[in-house]
UniProtKB/Swiss-Prot annotation:
A Pfam family that the UniProt record links to this protein: DUF167
InterPro entries the UniProt entry points to: DUF167, YggU-like_sf
Source domain of life: Bacteria
Protein name: UPF0235 protein Neut_2146
Native source organism of the sequence: Nitrosomonas eutropha (strain DSM 101675 / C91 / Nm57)
Homology family: Belongs to the UPF0235 family.
GO cellular component, one term: cytoplasm
Matching SUPFAM superfamilies: YggU-like
């Protein structure tokens, strides 16, 4: 599968490794079979999960309600579904290359 795939309904499934409490929120690169994302939010009271959803909604140009955390609510390893994204997963790599 790698770090992403499309399901039969063309929803994007992402496997992510999250590093909360970072200086800024950004995609870093591939970490094993997951994409590593640093989050500026702390890992408490769902703040990091909320920051992740907002980050992904902006990058994939979808409403926040189209981002679903499928697995890993209290883990650094997460699986996220993005319902019918406007942009493909390459938007995260474009961000990495721009640095």
């Amino acid at each position: 599968m790698g770090w992403y795939c499309l399901d039969r309904d063309h929803n994007l499934i992402l496997k992510l490794y999250i590093q909360p409490g970072a200086r800024q929120t950004e995609a870093i690169g591939v970490h094993g079979e997951e994409l590593k994302i640093k989050l500026a939010a702390p890992p408490m009271d769902g703040k990091a999960n909320r920051a992740l959803a907002v980050f992904l909604a902006k990058r994939f140009n979808v409403p926040l309600k189209h981002i679903t955390l499928k697995w890993g609510a209290q883990s650094r390893h997460k699986v996220v579904e993005i319902y019918q994204p406007v942009n493909g997963p390459e938007v995260l790599f474009n961000e990495i290359r721009a640095e």
